């Protein structure tokens, strides 16, 4: 009989909550929130500090990655799910090579709850940046083969058209697209890919002014295509720029970009890593824009990251989704994450959480509008789609001070862009929790001003 090997604590002091930052600081940069997460006592929209016991109202959800909040009852009370999760966690198979019932159940559920019939191809990987990275690889391969089929040099098709203010990740290709903060990209080698203005909606602009902004961005896009003939593989954009400042675009702009992509034989890619999985009130934000992408990159709330693809991709028969090993990774996503993701998606489906995000998003937006009416010089441009809501302040210093004041009031929100506070509550957030967050903002604003 095999001996049971038990976990043995190393000699020295135990790692208690009050030592977490000390222990981590010996080996890594510790610049996160000043909290030690209590994985047991945290629940729903509240994070509990394991050191102090203080409860923080969570309006950031681990940068929009937690769909149901902490310890959702539908998962905590499901013993069958616990057994499945433990079974998956005991091993980490290479999903790209060896398939399992757990993986098949996840893929089936993903396709049912989040799938787009026009985008039938799925590829899974660990990390949102790698999701975008593989979307780009799919586009590069497609453009090269499309060129070759039309008598054009297949070495062309190496460039990506993208927007100013974009955040698409920190990996190799994506570093050439991300341009929110110099700290993220400075001193790393990057490709000189075409970047155009982002004609996002903002206060004070009427329809003609918005149309003029869009026309200029479209002029820049056309110029990029014309000066790089056959070399732009795709246009990639976030439907709403999150890290860049919760910047919203009119559907007309993306519709025009779809037409340009078709005219110049480039793929349209939406990066829905932050906007996807119901945050905006639909499975994907692009579904509210009446624009059909060829590829969608996803992550965060989906737990497992990856891409959905179809439409023009299938005009090339030997695309990366049909040829073995063109896209691959050892893990092909994490099986433990797949089990958790499947159960989360089942809960989202059963409880109608996309529809709930619409209704509670309207409520949150209305409460932000009230703040703007009461503090018109400070609370600027309240905006949102579903629960993806935000507002701006006059200066970066004002924004940063408000976030500090909210932290002191045990409310966690996120900065974005130069002057924006963004709300990223779980899909399960209640109106009472929204009220509590708004009350904290209301009490903090006089201190900021």
UniProtKB/Swiss-Prot annotation:
Which co-factor is required? Answer: pyridoxal 5'-phosphate
Modification N6-(pyridoxal phosphate)lysine, positions: 300
Q: Which Pfam families match?
A: Aminotran_3 (PF00202)
Question: Quick one: effect of changing residue 328 to A?
Answer: Loss of activity but can still bind pyridoxal 5'-phosphate
Cystine residue pairs: none
Report a single Gene Ontology molecular function: L-lysine 6-transaminase activity
Impact when changing residue 330 to A/S: Loss of activity. Cannot bind pyridoxal 5'-phosphate
Kindly list the positions annotated as binding L-lysine: 170
At which positions is pyridoxal 5'-phosphate bound? 128-129, 274
Q: Cross-referenced SUPFAM superfamilies, in alphabetical order? A: PLP-dependent transferases (SSF53383)
A Gene Ontology biological process term: antibiotic biosynthetic process
Q: Which PROSITE patterns match?
A: AA_TRANSFER_CLASS_3
* Up-regulation conditions: 42-fold induced by starvation. Expression is regulated by the HTH-type transcriptional regulator LrpA.
Activity regulation, short description: Inhibited by 2-aminomethyl piperidine derivative.
UniProt-annotated binding residues for 2-oxoglutarate? 170, 274, 422
Q: Which EC number applies?
A: 2.6.1.36
For this chain, the family text in UniProt reads: Belongs to the class-III pyridoxal-phosphate-dependent aminotransferase family.
Q: How does it assemble?
A: Homodimer.
PANTHER family named among the record's database cross-references: 4-AMINOBUTYRATE AMINOTRANSFERASE GABT, AMINOTRANSFERASE
Q: What is known of its domains?
A: Contains a Glu-243 'switch' that allows the enzyme to change substrate preferences in the two half-reactions. The unique substrate L-lysine is recognized specifically when Glu-243 maintains a salt bridge with Arg-422. On the other hand, the binding of the common C5 substrates L-glutamate and alpha-ketoglutarate is enabled when Glu-243 switches away and unshields Arg-422.
Q: What's the protein here called? A: L-lysine-epsilon aminotransferase
């Amino acid at each position: 009989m095999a001996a049971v090997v038990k976990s043995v604590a190393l000699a020295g002091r135990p790692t208690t909550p009050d030592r977490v930052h000390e222990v981590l600081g010996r080996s890594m940069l510790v610049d996160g929130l000043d909290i030690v997460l209590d994985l047991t006592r945290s629940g729903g929209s509240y994070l509990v500090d394991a050191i102090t016991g203080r409860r923080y109202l969570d309006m950031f959800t681990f940068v929009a990655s937690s769909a149901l909040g902490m310890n959702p009852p539908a998962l905590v009370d499901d013993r069958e799910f616990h057994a499945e999760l433990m079974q998956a966690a005991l091993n980490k198979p290479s999903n790209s090579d060896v398939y399992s019932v757990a993986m098949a159940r996840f893929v089936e559920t993903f396709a049912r709850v989040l799938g787009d019939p026009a985008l039938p191809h799925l590829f899974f990987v660990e990390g949102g940046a790698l999701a975008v990275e593989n979307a780009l690889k799919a586009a590069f391969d497609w453009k090269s083969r499309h060129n070759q089929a039309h008598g054009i040099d297949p070495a062309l098709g190496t460039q990506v058209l993208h927007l100013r203010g974009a955040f698409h990740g920190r990996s190799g290709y994506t570093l050439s697209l991300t341009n929110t903060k110099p700290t993220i990209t400075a001193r790393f080698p990057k490709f000189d890919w075409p970047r155009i203005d982002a004609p996002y909606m903002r206060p004070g602009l009427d329809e003609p002014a918005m149309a003029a902004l869009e026309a200029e961005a479209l002029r820049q896009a056309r110029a990029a295509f014309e000066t790089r003939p056959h070399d732009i593989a795709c246009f990639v954009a976030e439907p709403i720029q999150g890290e860049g400042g919760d910047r919203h675009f009119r559907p007309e702009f993306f519709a025009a970009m779809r037409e340009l992509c078709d005219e110049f034989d480039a793929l349209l890619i939406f990066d829905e890593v932050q906007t996807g999985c119901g945050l905006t009130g639909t499975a994907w934000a692009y579904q509210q824009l009446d624009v059909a992408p060829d590829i969608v990159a996803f992550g965060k709330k989906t737990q497992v990251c990856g891409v959905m693809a179809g439409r023009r991709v299938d005009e090339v028969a030997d695309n990366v989704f049909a040829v073995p090993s063109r896209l691959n990774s050892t893990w092909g996503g994490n099986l433990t994450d797949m089990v958790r993701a499947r159960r989360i998606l089942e809960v989202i489906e059963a409880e109608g959480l996309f529809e709930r995000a619409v209704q509670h998003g309207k409520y949150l937006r209305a409460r932000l509008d009230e703040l703007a009416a009461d503090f018109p010089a400070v609370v600027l441009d309240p905006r949102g789609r579903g629960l993806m809501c935000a507002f701006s302040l006059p200066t970066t210093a004002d924004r940063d001070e408000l976030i500090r004041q909210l932290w002191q009031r045990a409310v966690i929100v996120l900065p974005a862009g130069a002057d924006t506070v963004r709300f990223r509550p779980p899909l399960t957030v209640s109106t009472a929790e929204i009220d509590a967050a708004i009350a904290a903002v209301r009490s903090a604003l006089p201190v900021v001003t």
